[in-house]
């Protein structure tokens, strides 16, 4: 039985990761186009190129983590070693040097690539930790819930407070230089908090599950085993598709409110002396609704199974996303209502995915004798990165295709394109995700059989 403090400690890790992840997803595109002055198409291409490399880098980290041996375990040490680099490179990513447009684009390539690599280097071991904290599927389901609740709490805090901090540090000035300073200082605050949370995760967690045999196989053997793991392939496709859905919606939200809703025409909402813009509230409401989805995932999956819960949630999100296109700019109540229900559906699927990845490690151990926890969980990060890369690249390219020009009034064609980013395009991702998960073979009954068999083998090995 895992103690409450350890569950909370594990949640701290994804709280830290998600603060940066959501800020990148929601604000990095518009930061590059409207604050740093880079062309939208160039940014889209950069996202795709850097994320493709980063997706390849994830399994390298997973293999290295599987072979790491320290007094702290295989995966926890990475939280200790990389918390500060994670924070520091995050700050560099949101800095705005003056190297000319070509030089600035090169700077963006370098800092963004480094950021995604250090994200992988800390997040892949963190995700893998989930698979070795307990051998019991019910414990891992609980850990998935804690992980995602804290992830969405972190996202909620970051999305709610980031733009108010930008305005505070910029002195409420609209001058570009002041805005650039505000963005950098706001990310400094978030980065410090992320480092503290990673240290908390390291201190409060413990690795318990040992493989039946120590890691002796070669990288070639590990990759061969992975490529023959059918559930892994299915989850990879489902994860990529789900992240395309999320990344397009998140990346286009600020454009939607800035250029279609014209949020400047509305008075900012003030709470406790802090002023919030509509786009920030919209994103934060989505994160709060995600938490509801996470909480509902466990009881729903216990009743009808993980697979049915996942498919049902994504199908509902598909229908609501398509209907979103026809909402008018004056339908703010409906826009926020749709955001709540779409986000509840989106929130419910990710704890299910993490739990399914943990099941894949058991399946791998049963079939090959090799858990390859880090390598398998690296695919979860890989699917995140690759799905996000595809989604943001599509956003950048289509913004250019529809004639987007930063900080000007947009044409009707551009506005129609921006509306598609929150409707038809995300729906494609949800539908593809449902198609993939329909073929997932590890039912609850099957996993009980696998768990019992592995427990017997572990006892025999330890005798």
State where each predicted segment sits:
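Membrane-embedded alpha-helical bundles of multi-pass transporters/translocases
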Residues: 1-463
């Amino acid at each position: 039985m895992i103690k409450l403090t350890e569950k909370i400690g594990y949640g701290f890790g994804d709280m830290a990761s998600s603060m940066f992840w959501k800020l990148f997803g929601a604000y990095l595109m518009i930061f590059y186009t409207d604050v740093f002055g880079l062309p939208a198409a160039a940014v889209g291409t950069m996202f795709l190129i850097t994320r493709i490399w980063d997706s390849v880098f994830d399994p390298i980290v997973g293999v290295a983590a599987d072979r790491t041996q320290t007094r702290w375990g295989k995966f926890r040490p990475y939280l200790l070693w990389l918390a500060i680099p994670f924070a520091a490179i995050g700050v560099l990513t949101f800095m705005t040097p003056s190297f000319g447009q070509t030089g600035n684009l090169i700077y963006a390539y370098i800092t963004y690539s480094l950021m995604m690599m250090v994200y992988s280097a800390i997040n892949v071991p963190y995700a893998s930790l989930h698979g070795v904290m307990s051998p019991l599927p019910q414990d891992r389901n609980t850990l998935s819930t804690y992980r995602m609740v804290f992830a969405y709490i972190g996202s909620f805090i970051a999305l709610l407070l980031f733009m108010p901090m930008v305005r505070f540090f910029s002195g409420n000035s609209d001058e570009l230089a002041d805005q650039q300073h505000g963005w950098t200082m706001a990310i400094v605050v978030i980065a410090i908090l992320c480092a503290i949370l990673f240290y908390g995760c390291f201190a409060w967690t413990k690795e318990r599950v040992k493989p039946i045999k120590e890691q002796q196989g070669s990288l070639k053997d590990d990759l061969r085993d992975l490529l023959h793991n059918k559930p892994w392939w299915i989850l990879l496709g489902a994860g990529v598709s789900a992240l395309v859905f999320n990344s397009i919606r998140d990346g286009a939200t600020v454009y939607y409110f800035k250029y279609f809703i014209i949020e400047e025409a509305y008075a900012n909402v003030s709470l406790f002396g802090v002023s919030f813009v509509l786009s920030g509230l919209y994103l934060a409401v989505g994160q709060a609704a995600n938490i509801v989805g996470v909480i509902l995932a466990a009881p729903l999956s216990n009743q009808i199974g993980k697979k049915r819960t996942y498919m049902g949630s994504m199908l509902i999100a598909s229908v609501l996303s398509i209907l979103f296109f026809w909402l008018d700019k004056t339908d703010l109540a409906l826009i926020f209502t749709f955001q709540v229900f779409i986000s509840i559906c989106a929130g419910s699927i990710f704890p299910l995915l993490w739990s399914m990845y943990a099941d894949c490690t058991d399946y791998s151990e049963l079939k090959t004798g090799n858990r390859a926890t880090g390598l398998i969980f690296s695919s979860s990060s890989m699917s995140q990165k690759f799905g996000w890369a595809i989604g943001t690249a599509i956003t950048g390219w289509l913004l250019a295709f529809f004639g987007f020009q930063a900080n000007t009034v947009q044409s009707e064609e551009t506005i129609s394109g921006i509306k598609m980013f929150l409707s038809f395009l995300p729906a494609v991702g949800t539908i593809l995700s449902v198609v993939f998960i329909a073929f997932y073979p590890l039912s609850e009954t099957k996993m009980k059989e696998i768990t019992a068999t592995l427990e017997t083998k572990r006892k025999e090995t330890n005798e």
